[in-house]
Amino acid sequence: MQTLFLSLLAAAVTVHAYGSGGSNWDQAYSRAKDALQKLNQTEKVGLVTGVKWMGGPCVGNTYKPESIDYPSLCLQDSPLGIRFANPVTAFPAGINAGATWDTQLLYARGAAMGAEAKGLGIHVQLGPVAGPLGKNPNGGRNWEGFSVDPYLSGVAMEKTIRGMQDSGVQACAKHWLGNEQEHYRDTISSNIGDRAAHELYVWPFMDAVKAGVASVMCSYNKVNGTWACESDALNNKLMKEELGFPGYIMSDWNAQHSTVNSAVSGLDMTMPGSDFSNPPGSIFWGSNLEAAVADGSVPQSRLDDMVTRILAAWYLVGQDQGYPPVAFSSWNGGKANVDVTADHGTVARAVARDSIVLLKNGHGTLPLRKPKSLAIVGSDAIVNPAGPNACSDRGCNNGTLAMGWGSGTAEFPYLVGPLDAIQKRAAADGTKIVPSTTDDPTAGASAAAAAETAIVFINSDSGEGYITVEGNLGDRNNLDPWHNGNELVKAVAAASKNVIVVIHSVGPIILETILAQPSVKAIVWAGLPGQESGNALVDVIYGDTTPSGKLPYTIAKQAADYGASWINAETDDFPEGLYVDYRHFDAKGIAPRYEFGYGLSYTTFKYSGLWVNMDASAGAANGQVVPGGPADLFEVVGQVSVSVRNNGRVAGAEVAQLYLGLPDSAPATPPKQLRGFQKLMLQPGQTGRATFKLTRRDLSYWDVQQQKWVVPSGTFKVYVGSSSRDIREEGSFRVRRGW
């Protein structure tokens, strides 16, 4: 089935590669500078200023100049599909895409989203998400991003951006920087140490810039005491100078706080141009910016730079070549006059399916083998009776959970609920279904007692802080299942000898109560699977596909083990530093329940033949700055490979993972860090070779004194395995000091 998908994918997504390398930016800049000469001052200001909230068909719109052939730019959410429009595809969330660990699917998802955005006339799609990274396991918007690990998140950013922009839409990497919680997000100062900032939070943005991302969105919060959208250190020095970003920085909606400071500190576009209620005096740019340039408060060169960056991004992805007009309005129900979905449901189903993580499978409970009867228990098994889009921006948790809430959502064209999909399969198998689609423990136990096997559906939701759901102001109040999920599982487990638990969640939940039930034989994490939820689940639990997802974060035994959570204060000093998620667990010697990178299969894999070839010298990266950072930072300096054999009786995909431990000469470094992965699809008895190419950056740490990436001298440890703790092969290599 996975082999078949690749051929279907070619038909599902047609892209045209415009390229995102430095030479293409050079060409785009040349054209942008020519266009700049034709614009008057008011037109220039119009290109960098939103027309105000609800001032056009999209959530963000700019003014259309008359002097050049350039549109009113349409900017639209979200990172998992098109918000406020229909019909569109509601793709699995970023956290699911990350859980696939599949670079082909990451690209395909990005390309399909980009194709839909272009078809609707959207110029800038507001995604993907690298921040929040997810240092707080209950952070409200973690699910919009790909992983708590910067390396995995960075690869996902790169592949997604390339897919989106190859389809013709401008991508927007967000939220820059330190937006790790929803509580106090409009006022909090994220005080991040220089080294932790570079090695964790900036890292995936480096990959985004290297991939040629057109735009970056600065966040609501302060960073080290200064608003992110008017931070010279963050935007000019770090993003534009150190990372060599040629594109433009836009504000998050109403994240701008000044006229002059934001302009001279590197902001290039303000959105949406006014406060949401459009009060007088809420427009910082527009005529105010024009006046500031006229009196010299903002240099003319700064305004021209803003405009050039915005125009260059437009040329970079080829939007000057027959781009379609906007085909919907966000404010009248979003009905589009064109259907852009094609067969992107194929991509959505593949991502949802291959992101499913099998956490437990005692006694070979899964896959199901035509059981005589099945109890389906829990409200999470069915679609919200009021409809999948009944709550604005998905701001409720009624029925099965397939995406979180907030601006990072999309309208479901349909939602296949788990019960519906299982009933369809059960009818073909002759299996009797005994449903209990509430969260009442007594009713659930009654249904379970009447069936051979019971499947209990539980969930945990979160989202953006402008919506509060069941007392959760964006961030989750705790890491427990919602709707009394633990009690529901306990009741069902007391009534049935064979219980399977399916989890739809935005992030980790504490599973100790569930694991304490002897009759809970299998646990499946399905995340936020989007419109194809039920179909993808059936593909896996019935064995049509072997599960191949791996956790993009750690599941702890207790919430306190994470050492981080959102704080009820307006200052977060990021005391954990580099030690986030598995880095923290490893350094502190804390045993997780399920570690980062973990995921079971219906088959087994044997690793052998580790090979290491390295040609690196110690020292700092000093190359010319290119998009992403110093050019020599991205040079390949070595290679690691390992053989993986499928020892089982069914085909399966294994994610081989490479972790590196830096030498003792590197100060205060986590024991190991992810630095490579490859997903191998293997038939029974087949052996494949996973190969990991290592760059100087992969071997480096950020030296706060030198203000450079430095490869330390000494012995590096090499760990290759099936997860961050299931290490199958170990080795080492030595790096000597350069001359």
UniProtKB/Swiss-Prot annotation:
Sequence intervals crossing the membrane: none
Name the Enzyme Commission number(s) assigned to this protein.
Answer: 3.2.1.21
A single GO CC term for this protein reads: extracellular region
Stored Gene3D superfamilies:
Glycoside hydrolase family 3 C-terminal domain, Glycoside hydrolase, family 3, N-terminal domain, Immunoglobulins
Q: Which GO terms describe its molecular function?
A: beta-glucosidase activity
Q: Which InterPro entries does this entry report, sorted A to Z?
A: Cellulose_deg_GH3 (IPR050288), Fn3-like (IPR026891), Glyco_hydro_3_C (IPR002772), Glyco_hydro_3_C_sf (IPR036881), Glyco_hydro_3_N (IPR001764), Glyco_hydro_3_N_sf (IPR036962), Glycoside_hydrolase_SF (IPR017853), Ig-like_fold (IPR013783)
Q: Spell out the catalytic residues.
A: 252
Could you tell me what this protein does?
Beta-glucosidases are one of a number of cellulolytic enzymes involved in the degradation of cellulosic biomass. Catalyzes the last step releasing glucose from the inhibitory cellobiose.
- What family does the Swiss-Prot or TrEMBL record give for this protein? Belongs to the glycosyl hydrolase 3 family.
What protein is this chain from? Answer: Probable beta-glucosidase L
What organism is listed for this UniProt entry?
Aspergillus fumigatus (strain CBS 144.89 / FGSC A1163 / CEA10) (Neosartorya fumigata)
- Please state the gene responsible for encoding this protein: bglL
